[in-house]
Amino acid sequence: MTPTPLRVLLSAVGVAAAAHLARADAPSQDRAAPAAARVDDLMRRLTQEEKLSLLGGDRDFYIRPVPRLGIPEIKMADGPLGVRNYGPSTAYPATIGLAASWDPDLAREFGAAVGSDARARGVHIMLGPAVNINRVPRNGRNFEYLSEDPYLAGAVAAQIVAGIQIQGVVATVKHFAANNQETDRGTIDARVSERALREIYLPAFRAAVEQGHAWAVMCAYNRLNGSYCSANDWLNNRVLKGDWAFKGVLMSDWGAAHDTPGVANGGLDLEMPSGRFMNPGALGPLIASGQISQATIDDKVRRILTLEVANGFLDRPQLLSSTPKDDPRSAAVALKVAREAIVLLKNDHGALPITGKKLRRIVVLGPNAAGLPAGGGSAHVEPFHYVSVVDGLKRVVGRKVKIDAIPGPGPELLRSLLAKTTFEGPLKLEFMTFDWENRKEIAAVTDTRIDHDWDAGAPAPVVDAADYTARWTGAIRAPATGRFIFMVQNHGFVTVKLDGRTLISSWANPNDALFAEAPLEAGRPYAVEVMAHHDNQGPAGIHFAWGAAPPTLTDDQAARVRAADAVVVCVGFNAMLEGEGADRAYELPNDQPELILRAAELNPRTIVVVNSGGVVATADWIGKVPALLQAWYPGQEGGRAVADVLVGAVNPSGKLPISYEKRREDSPSYGHYPGSGGTVDYAEGILVGYRGFDTKGVAPLYPFGYGLSYTTFSYDKLHVEPTQDGRWAVTFDVTNNGAQGGDEVSEVYVSPPVTSKAGRPVRELRGFSREHLATDQTMTVTVVLDRHAFSYYDEAKRDWVVEPGSYTVEVGASSRNILLAGAVDLN
């Protein structure tokens, strides 16, 4: 029957009335209601089963929905360097490079771009930033972190968080706390004094929570002073939720929970990736017996619901389909960060920028010249496209200058080695389920080579084509003593082991070839294991080969290097060699030092570009080259940024967020890493990084806060004056004395009174300012210090204390280049 207008009107009135009644009965659905009232309503309506189910993650990266109450499924994504897990995305520079910009405004811009990319994929929660202190130079995740200094790390972290969350996406600050090495990270007990925690390892987290207003914190895998971080009552309940009044959600790292009562009472709100210990079956009996209180459970549920309601997740779609996934605005931010991140460490005799009317040919060589160098693990992002250093130079120099690329080992070498690769007898090939924790063998056969293209099909009739692990085991025998290269091409995660030692462990791009070198003895058998994982992310197949390592440079390549007007050697690490799960080597890998030395021998105009998350050994070659750039992992636009700096289109302005020691033994943590017997003792206490170098009088190769420019700056006219609100204004002039505009980072340090009995560092960073100055421009800069800038943590008083006496306020261009000094008397 066709409805009459009256029926339509009555129907509309009925719907409106029903909607009004629904809002009255369910304040949780009333967008105009306060968040607390909406959460109260949801708490009343949730069943106990639903409450307990919310405390464990679902399908790896989700929080469970409650559809009947309008509570949506909440989607998460790694990580700190861009949106991972859901296909290609903008690959930003490593955040240690962002910290090297000393630019909090840029950090906020970076966070906002990441948040926008997240909305383009319907992501509610980003699992970043990562803000642990760079204590150990070899830490595999240093590239994800920010600095050895807590003030700089906190200033950058707070703005990343604010930027992400301004887009309607939750930021997750990780890894809480003292997760400063990957070696034994799942079990190691970090023994750290409360003073060192309060002064060094916790301030960046505190800044992210109190200044950035982070909605989520992720606990670390390790133990801290005896207790796993996921169940550490002092860390989670007293400090985070007590002292800092954190109202958000504390989640576990993936698989970091170890028992139900420990994590429930120890402050954990959400177990990820699933509720192995935080589920109705495990929690229910403990609540009934009184081991876990209902109030404890309700607090966790309330925190999760408050996060969801306050961030609008119940009221709007999270997906912004109008935002492109490959967003040129995000790419522009990635380029800006990459440019500001680059630190010019050495520039003798004006080797840089590469300019001149007679410039005709630049040779670019090294393993990172033509690819995308990036750190590995959960922070690794696969971009839609990228610009290599070779590509970047070709773009900026035009047709008048030839860019002569000499690539490192790649697919072409792999193909030539495949025909020569042999094994000692047949290989055992096992197929297993893809489940990382509980692999089950499906089938076992023999194979004669590892050279297969399975595409979308199954490698064996009984194997699921979408999800499987294949493992080959066998032996090889070297025909001669010398260095040999091992190469593999795969789509997915792949590991290669030689006599039990891991040579390759990385996600692989099917268009590239991973490689590692190792010395072998003639006639000796070596056990080989190759394991490849396929998880339906692309065509399946694997190609593995080994053979004699190629020469550092062929005769033809050497001639090209000798004849070049400039040589750029791109060295460092990559996703296979530096990343989550293991700490990296201190020395440059494979034959990279020999490559630098050979290039420098052939051509004195050799410039080195290093990609790494931190310090690398330089003693063997630093005296042989005139120029050195620390480019970190510069992201998808990194090749263009490096090229811009090399040719002078961009004036380098980055400054080290870490200290660059001359040798590994000089690091304050040396001798207190990686620990033994399941424990690592942070015996250096608060003397981390430059605090240790300066206090103990050890000269670094390049100090904290150091970075050269193509122009020069001078400092003058320091004034330190009290303000009406009890703070101190540090005012000084900075002048650009050179012929090129540039950015300068001015650093403000505080030194304790000479009468101090508190065992304080010689100086500590307490403020900074980044400014752009045109040629001959003078700018007056003011940095304001609050009372906390003069305090230390007194363990006996369990409080921050300001000692009476005369403090020195220092202004400089690095921790070892103090240019101005004044005094503040606190009596």
Predicted regions and their residues:
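Bacterial N-terminal signal peptides that target proteins for export
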Residues: 1-10
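Flexible, membrane-facing loop/turn or short amphipathic-helix motifs
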Residues: 795-796
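Short beta-strand elements
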Residues: 817-827
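Glycoside hydrolase catalytic-domain context in secreted enzymes
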Residues: 22-485, 489-792, 801, 806-816
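Bacterial N-terminal signal peptides
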Residues: 9-18
